[in-house]
Amino acid sequence: MAIDVKAIEEHIRGILIALGDNPEREGLKDTPKRVAKMYEEVFKGMCYSNDEIAEMFNITFEDDLCINDNENDMVFMKEIEIFSHCEHHLALMYNMKVAIAYIPKGKIIGLSKMARIADMVGRRLQLQERIGSDIAEILQKITGSEDVAVIIEGEHGCMTTRGIKKSGTKTITTTLRGKFNTDPIISNKLMMLYTK
C-alpha cells in the first residue's frame, strides 16, 4: 500500500482551516507539504504487512551456528530505541525501548535486522501491545523459532500531553511466546537479562 501524499496535503490544509488559521500565510504555506512528507517517513511501516517485513529482513545465518542439545541458549537484545504513534489520538509514543529475545532453532537473524524490524513495526498507527505482537510474529516467521519474547517500555503523548497529563508515566508491555511463556527458568533468565 502506498501512502497518498497528495490526499494528506489536502487534509492537513483543511485541518489548518478548521483550527481557524490561514494556510496561505507565510509560516503555514508549505506546512501541508511538510506534514505529508513527514507522515510518509514516520508511517513507512504502514506500507508493509508483517509477511512483507519478514521477507524484507529474512537474512539468517546457519553455517556458523553451533546448536546445543539443551535448546535453552538465548539471543537477547535490549535498549532498541523506536517511536510510534497511538492509533487512538495520533499522539506520539516516545522514549520507547524494545527488548527482543529468542531461542534459535537452527538459524539466527542478524542483530541489525532485529532493530530494523522493531523500527519498521513502530512506523505504523499502533498500540504498544500490538508492536510487541507484530515483532514476535515477524521474528517467528524469520527464525522458525516459536520461542520469542518482546518487552517494550514507552511513554505515550495521549497520557502525558492531554487528558490526565501525567508526564514521565511509562507503560511496559510483554509479549511472550513458546518457552518464554511456559518455562519458568527461561522466563527468569529473560527477566534477569532485562533488568541487568
Curated annotation (Swiss-Prot):
Gene3D superfamilies: 1.10.286.10, 3.30.1130.10. Homomer. Keywords: GTP-binding, Hydrolase, Metal-binding, Nucleotide-binding, One-carbon metabolism, Zinc. Its EC number is 3.5.4.16. It is an enzyme of class 3 (hydrolase). It catalyses: GTP + H2O = 7,8-dihydroneopterin 3'-triphosphate + formate + H(+). Belongs to the GTP cyclohydrolase I family. The keyword Metal-binding applies. It comes from Clostridium botulinum (strain Loch Maree / Type A3). One of its GO terms (biological process) is one-carbon metabolic process. GO terms for molecular function: GTP binding; GTP cyclohydrolase I activity; zinc ion binding. SUPFAM superfamilies: Tetrahydrobiopterin biosynthesis enzymes-like. This is GTP cyclohydrolase 1. PANTHER family: GTP CYCLOHYDROLASE 1, GTP CYCLOHYDROLASE I. Pathway: Cofactor biosynthesis; 7,8-dihydroneopterin triphosphate biosynthesis; 7,8-dihydroneopterin triphosphate from GTP: step 1/1. GO terms for cellular component: cytoplasm. NCBIfam families: folE, PRK09347.1-2, PRK09347.1-3. Pfam families: GTP_cyclohydroI.
